[in-house]
């Protein structure tokens, strides 16, 4: 993530970073846990969680997952302190500085806990604070809040209306694009008939479920789980009304970038995984709207496992444990073991040279 921020800032112009604060818990590992090299851990990996129970909250929209309790953050603090103490026994680094940075990190977590109403908000607040500490100055916004702004809803609804009206064409366009993926490298899921690029968090359980289109006479019914929403003619006006009624519960799916492009976003920074989707998104954009995909900047790197924490584990075990062979330094790792100037330089070199 930091390399993308650095690349985005280097581009200049009116750039911003949007937090997808509505993703379902468990859909990506980084939302469920943070992994760090640890001398004391059985496999060399310390796994931190910021929610009480992954099993209980699995699949829930992050806006509906409770914020971390104070007791949970206290356990995180103790584990991080122990990690630093153990590492200092096996390698040379400024332990007192690491403890000071840990106190600063934890102060940010506590502030985020006080201000947040959900895990999604906690992640956004804590991350934005840390990014600011590292000197990143571009705006950080909640994607769900941005897309729900009254002045943007007409464009969102207009684009959604096209997706619904041309739902068969969307399925066809996705299949056409995926026909080029002979080696199965896109990791893009084919879309079924009635696909709508919209998801809804369950009113009772907060589970994020995709909506699908079912026609009933002239009415367009959007169905998810046990809930059905009548979008009427599914024109822009009726969809604005529907989105306003579902405020705080709806979110866009993998086609979200196309909605942003239609709003006027003129470029995007992607990583190794997300840039592959551009083949499909670009084809859908052309078939559906007759427009080209906006410019992409691939910003990614695969650095070797490194840093004081890795050095400590290797020294203690006589080599790199299998669980850490694909480890990429997290921002927490960097922040605890380096000064801000060093971190920014490592980040700058990483995305320009492809590795640190």
What do the PLM-derived regions correspond to, one by one?
Residues 1-3, 7-356:
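N-terminal targeting/trafficking signals and adjacent low-complexity tails
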């Amino acid at each position: 993530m930091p390399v993308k921020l650095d690349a985005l800032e280097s581009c200049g112009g009116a750039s911003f970073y949007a937090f997808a604060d509505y993703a379902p818990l468990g859909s990506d590992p980084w939302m469920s846990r943070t992994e760090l090299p640890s001398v004391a851990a059985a496999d060399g990996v310390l796994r931190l969680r910021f929610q009480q129970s992954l099993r209980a909250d699995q699949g829930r929209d992050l806006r509906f997952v409770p914020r971390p309790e104070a007791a949970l953050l206290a356990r995180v603090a103790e584990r991080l302190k122990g990690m630093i103490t153990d590492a200092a026994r096996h390698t040379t680094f400024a332990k007192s500085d690491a403890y000071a940075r840990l106190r600063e990190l934890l102060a940010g977590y506590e502030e985020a806990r006080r201000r947040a109403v959900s895990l999604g908000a906690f992640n956004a607040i804590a991350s934005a604070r840390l990014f600011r500490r590292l000197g990143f100055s571009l705006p950080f916004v909640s994607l769900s809040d941005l897309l729900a702004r009254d002045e943007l809803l007409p464009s969102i609804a207009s684009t959604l209306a096209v997706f619904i009206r041309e739902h068969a064409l969307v399925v066809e366009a996705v299949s056409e694009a995926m026909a080029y993926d002979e080696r199965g490298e896109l990791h893009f899921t084919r879309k079924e008939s009635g696909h709508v690029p919209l998801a809804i968090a369950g009113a009772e359980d907060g589970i994020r479920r995709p909506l699908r289109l079912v026609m009933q006479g002239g009415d367009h019914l959007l169905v998810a789980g046990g809930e059905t929403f009548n979008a009427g003619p599914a024109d822009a006006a009726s969809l604005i009304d529907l989105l306003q009624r579902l405020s705080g519960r709806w979110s866009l799916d993998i086609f979200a970038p196309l909605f942003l492009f239609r709003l006027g976003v003129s470029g995007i920074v992607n990583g190794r995984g997300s840039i592959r989707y551009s083949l499909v998104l670009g084809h859908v954009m052309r078939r559906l709207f007759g427009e080209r995909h906006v410019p992409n900047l691939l910003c990614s790197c695969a650095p070797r496992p490194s840093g004081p924490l890795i050095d400590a584990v290797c020294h203690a075990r006589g080599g790199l444990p299998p669980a850490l062979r694909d480890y990429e330094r997290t921002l927490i790792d960097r922040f605890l073991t380096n000064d801000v100037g060093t971190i920014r330089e490592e980040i700058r070199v990483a995305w320009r040279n492809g590795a640190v």
